[in-house]
């Protein structure tokens, strides 16, 4: 499953979509709580390092320590979120589905750079489902995650995982799409 789109579809070269989580921005991270912000920064650094390793030696498997660091950062974030008494205890169904998919697919070390890249984007999507649509200073509650285009587009993660455009926008008001 290629969550960033298939090779050759991205402007800037045939592998421009690989490790797309390396393009995260401080503006996006500012929308997150502390635990999510730490995770997003770690994921961006891991993705950048993995992409540089891929460019240098594309035929080699990704370094297992990169996946280990990503799992550790994700586990730390989940632990901090679980310990935060101010957050609601329930997890929306779509977030539970993504977490279940993460658990199912992410047990062994990734065998390729594409596989590692896909796992990192899945982790990023789970994270964005947590802050998208939440009110932040100066933004309305229906404000979408500013990285929503990564997930909610034809061929994006929502379409590939759920065969639907679920996005990571507003929590509570489902988006509607016209059928052609």
Swiss-Prot record:
Gene Ontology cellular component terms for the protein in this record? host cell nuclear matrix; viral tegument
Return the similarity comment. Belongs to the herpesviridae US10 family.
Posttranslational mods: Phosphorylated.
Lineage of origin: Viruses, Duplodnaviria, Heunggongvirae, Peploviricota, Herviviricetes
Q: Where in the cell is it found?
A: Virion tegument; Host nucleus matrix
GO: which molecular function terms? Answer: zinc ion binding
Write down the species: Varicella-zoster virus (strain Dumas) (HHV-3)
Identify the domain of life: Viruses
Q: Which UniProt keywords apply?
A: Host nucleus, Late protein, Virion, Virion tegument
Q: Record's InterPro entries? A: EHV_Unk
Q: What is this protein called?
A: Virion protein US10 homolog
């Amino acid at each position: 499953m290629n969550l960033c789109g298939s090779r050759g579809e991205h402007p800037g070269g045939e592998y421009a979509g690989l490790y797309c989580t390396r393009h995260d921005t401080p503006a996006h991270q500012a929308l997150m709580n502390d635990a999510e912000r730490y995770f997003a920064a770690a994921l961006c650094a891991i993705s950048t390092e993995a992409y540089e390793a891929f460019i240098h030696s594309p035929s080699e498997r990704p370094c297992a320590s990169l996946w280990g660091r990503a799992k550790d950062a994700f586990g730390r974030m989940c632990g901090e979120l679980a310990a935060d008494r101010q957050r609601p205890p329930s997890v929306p169904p779509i977030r539970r589905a993504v977490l279940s998919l993460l658990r199912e697919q992410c047990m062994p070390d990734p065998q390729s750079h594409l596989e590692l890249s896909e796992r990192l984007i899945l982790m990023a999507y789970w994270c964005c489902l947590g802050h998208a649509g939440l009110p932040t200073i100066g933004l309305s509650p229906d404000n979408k995650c500013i990285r929503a285009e990564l997930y909610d587009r034809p061929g994006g993660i929502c379409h590939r995982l759920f065969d639907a455009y679920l996005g990571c926008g507003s929590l509570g008001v489902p988006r509607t799409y016209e059928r052609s």
